[in-house]
Amino acid sequence: MAKMTTLKMKEKLEKELQAPNRQFSYNRDNDTLTVAQNGKKVTLTIPQIIANFENDGNAAVEKIVYYVEEGFRAAAGNVELENNKASIYPVVRATSFPDETKAGEALLTDDHTAETKIFYAVDLGKSYRFIEESMLKKAQLTHKEIREVAFNNLANLEIPLKKDSVNGNDFYFVRTNDGYDASRLLNEAFLREMREKLTGEMVLAVPHQDVLIIGDIQDNTGYDVLAHMTMDFFADGLVPITSLPFVYNNGKLEPIFIMAKNRLKE
């Protein structure tokens, strides 16, 4: 099979995503393709898509197309917060994630860690719509009320764990693909429960929105394995968050750097 190049992938994406009232712009310097429709934009990083394509074939492109189409559908819909309280959840993103829409509307956010920020979204089934500050006034709801509703809904989500072990270090994975796997990092009751269960240092990672990794780290090998896993997930994720893991101590999350086979403390 001929090697997939940036230009070939660009053409393939444009063909798959072609639709009325939709425009494409290619940034040669950054190898990104921006898809615009009715004032909304989605920017795709082509080298990342090619890497996924080499592993998963056309399924990688189909996933991107689905992600873009659902994103535009969500952006186009009018969402009433008052009638959708049961569908509001907190969403974890990188601190570098834009805190306003392309139209300049401020998104509802809360600070979290030096690496992560909390956004709020209304679940629409196959996608979700970020909540804008202006939507609160229309719904006559406060920031605090949205936060409480979102975290209560999060607490009701199941947290199935898949376990893997490497040289005495245990790793637990949350991968339900419901859009809120990384959000479970915000479930404090769950974190406390895991802390009581684990015997080593508790280290967590949210490399992208569809995975939460919890490590029961016993030695340097455990840190090394976690660092490699986190980087791999970060590179493969459609919505990357952070490649830095967090140590959980005394109810607090602290980002740490892990290099080679040694843990480097802050």
Curated annotation (Swiss-Prot):
Superkingdom: Bacteria
Residue intervals passing through the bilayer: none
Entry's family note: Belongs to the UPF0354 family.
Protein name: UPF0354 protein Lm4b_01619
Provenance organism: Listeria monocytogenes serotype 4b (strain CLIP80459)
Lineage of producing organism: Bacteria, Bacillati, Bacillota, Bacilli, Bacillales
